[in-house]
C-alpha cells in the first residue's frame, strides 16, 4: 500500500514538473531564421558591365567573357565545378585580379558580398564582436536582436567563430550581409549548409529584395525560385 502511494506521489510530481516546464517555455520561441534584405540607396540602372574577362591559373578557367546586369535583376552564374564561377565573383568584388578584361560598376552601386568559405569572419572573434566590429555604431541590444533573428541567443553570442559549425557561420555571414543594406548582392553558394526552412526564408528575402543580385549556386530549386 505504501509503495503504491509512493509511486502515485512520484507520478504526480512528474506531471507537475512537466506542467511547469510547459508553462515556462516561451510560446513565441524563435525556431526559424529571420532575414530582411533592404538597400539603403538605389543604384543607377546599369549596375555591372563585364567585358573581355579572362583568367587562368595552371589552366585556363575562362576567356573573353562579356555580360551586363541591370538594376533589379537576379542573375545566377551556373556551370560545372572548376569553371571559374567563384573566381568571377571574386574578380568583381576586387579580391582576385583578372588576367584581362574590364569590370565597370554603375553609379551608386554598393556591394554586399557573401563568401561561401566565410573568410570575411575572424575565427578568433566571438559572434557578438564580429558584428560589433563590422558595425561599430550598433548598440549592444540591436546586435543581440540581430543575432537572435539568426537563431543565436543567450550565451551563443559569446561563442568564437572557430567553434561554430559551417551552417552557423553561414548564418553569421548572412546577418552581416543584412546589416550592410547594400544594393548589389554578390553571393557565393548562399544555401550551402542551410536547412530547408532557412533556404526557403532566404529565397523569400531575395525575391522581396528591390536591389540587384548576382550569385553562384548548385541548388537548382533555389535557382528556379530566385533567378530572373
Which residues does each PLM region occupy?
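Extended, highly charged alpha-helical segments
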Residues: 1-34, 38, 99-100, 136-138, ...
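ABC ATP-binding cassette signature C-motif
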Residues: 35-228
